[in-house]
């Protein structure tokens, strides 16, 4: 199917100019004129803006306030004059039966992106369609997201049909779903050190970690389930499980810094404490990992266990699709972005609410994947004998360390790789600045420039002139600011840095100059 690019420019004084790559255009300050153009300017084509939210913002600003409130609530029965109207952030703009989509998410771009010409948008649109075709998921006219294209394809439908759902297990075993859910939602994201590394900080991650772990999971329809309050031989030999109990992580243990066990610590953040942790539920793999590497011990109360049925060769419901997506990454950088996004979003859908016929919710699988990622990091740290002073940060499926390691001989799905040794600034668990990464819309280069200009400051910001999107206006608590052309500040503050940490720092940088010139070590939270 054809795809047509669109561009919208705000000319001021209420006038908007909308142009399509097929040569159609309109310039008007009248909402009906603009909606009529969007509705009727092209036929039999997929229509795209690069940044859908930016384009929609100027149109939304013209909508009368009572109707705008309904649009903001995703009301599907809104009519503006003779035009049915629907808009969903980052997904779709619909006028009548004519739909518009955004390309930005396919390219993995952050919130703010450079302005791209209409010809450039058309080239990107053509690339997206060609890439989806080459990946076998191009048989759709709904470009709401990469995973939506996958779900609409025959490949996606067959994949979802073959994934066991949580509610399909015996009702007598439903409690294991609650155990799994309580063992989940514990991403390991920590800053062990804060400071500036111009070199000598190596970024390691496990390639397509969640996809790799999913590919190894057994089909639960080939398994038996049971609950036990003893950790006997049968329980120890289980394939999977979720155990309720309490960990004691050795405070002075040689490998306590490698612990995969996450709990709520300071500032209500998740972190890796040591000492006697409160009773919680953990995956069996976490218990095995802690005990195997001498990190601590576990006082078992009870748990749910899973093993393959005797005489049954287990199936692997995620194996084919995850390997397929990984192989398709080689097509192009765009294909790599799309394939990675689909794989991770399929995993994410394992804990989405069961609100549609194509729901694949399965708390067991999701908890096994996320806890498995933490255990993989522990295994990497222990087997490479990473010392506490060499570990700088952990970020879900990877680490940054100060020791150079030999590249592994194995590659492929789930292998460890070193992405390089890049200048990096670490400020807090979720503020790691390296290359063009943009935590909170600030880059490594931005920080250097701002600190060099004001070395003694503790607060920095830069501004970008953009239209306020509906999502941003909602976050501001005032939807009527949508479409307003305003300076959107991106801030970088050292004030209150303690409140961003999940570990104990005896000292922290107070100025930009101190941040760039020093490094700051931390200690874990100790539970009594």
Place the predicted regions along the sequence by residue.
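Gly/Thr-rich phosphate-binding beta-strand-loop-beta motif of the actin/hexokinase/Hsp70
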Residues: 1-21, 208
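Conserved acidic
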Residues: 21-528
């Amino acid at each position: 199917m054809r795809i047509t690019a669109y561009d919208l420019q705000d000319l001021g004084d209420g006038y908007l100019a909308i142009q399509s790559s097929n040569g159609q255009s309109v310039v008007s300050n009248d909402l009906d004129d603009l909606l009529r153009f969007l509705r009727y300017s092209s036929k039999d084509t997929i229509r795209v803006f690069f940044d859908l939210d930016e384009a929609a913002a100027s149109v939304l600003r013209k909508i009368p306030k009572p109707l705008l409130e309904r649009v903001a609530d995703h009301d599907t029965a809104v009519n503006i004059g003779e035009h049915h109207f629907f808009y969903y952030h980052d997904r779709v703009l619909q006028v009548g039966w004519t739909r518009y989509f955004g390309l930005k998410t396919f390219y993995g771009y952050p919130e703010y992106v450079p302005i791209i010409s209409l010809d450039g948008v058309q080239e990107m649109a053509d690339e997206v369609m060609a890439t989806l075709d080459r990946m076998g998921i191009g048989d759709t006219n709904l470009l709401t997201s990469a995973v939506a294209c996958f779900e609409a394809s025959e490949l996606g439908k067959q994949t979802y049909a073959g994934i066991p759902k949580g509610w399909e297990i015996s009702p007598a075993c439903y409690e294991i779903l609650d155990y799994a859910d309580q063992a989940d939602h514990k991403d390991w994201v920590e800053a062990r050190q804060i400071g500036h590394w111009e070199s000598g900080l190596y970024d390691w991650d496990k390639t397509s970690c969640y996809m790799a772990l999913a590919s190894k999971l057994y089909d639960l329809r080939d398994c038996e389930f049971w609950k036990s309050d003893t950790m006997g031989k049968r329980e120890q030999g289980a394939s999977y499980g979720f155990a309720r109990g309490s960990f004691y992580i050795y405070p002075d243990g040689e490998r306590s810094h490698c612990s995969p066990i996450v709990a709520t610590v300071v500032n209500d953040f998740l972190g890796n404490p040591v000492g006697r942790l409160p009773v919680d539920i953990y995956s069996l793999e976490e218990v095995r990992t802690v005990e195997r590497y001498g990190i601590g011990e576990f006082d078992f109360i009870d748990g749910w266990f899973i093993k393959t049925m005797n005489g049954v060769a287990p199936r692997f419901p995620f194996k084919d699709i995850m390997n397929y997506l990984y192989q398709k990454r080689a097509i192009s950088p765009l294909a790599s972005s799309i394939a990675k996004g689909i794989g991770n979003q399929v995993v994410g859908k394992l804990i989405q609410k069961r609100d549609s016929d194509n729901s694949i919710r399965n708390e067991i699988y999701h908890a096994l994947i996320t806890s498995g990622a933490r255990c993989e990091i522990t295994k990497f740290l222990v087997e490479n004998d990473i010392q506490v002073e060499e570990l700088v940060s952990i970020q879900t499926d990877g680490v940054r360390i100060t020791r150079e390691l030999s590249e592994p001989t194995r590659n492929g799905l789930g292998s460890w790789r070193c992405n390089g040794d890049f200048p990096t600034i670490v400020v807090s668990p979720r503020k790691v600045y390296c290359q063009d990464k943009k935590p909170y819309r600030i880059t490594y280069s931005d920080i250097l420039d701002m600190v060099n200009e004001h070395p003694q400051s503790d607060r920095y910001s830069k501004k970008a002139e953009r239209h306020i999107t509906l999502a941003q206006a909602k976050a501001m608590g005032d939807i009527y600011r949508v479409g307003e052309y305003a300076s959107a500040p991106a801030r970088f503050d050292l004030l209150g840095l303690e409140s961003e940490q999940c570990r104990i720092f005896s000292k922290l940088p107070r100025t930009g100059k101190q941040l760039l010139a020093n490094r700051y070590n931390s200690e874990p939270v100790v539970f009594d």
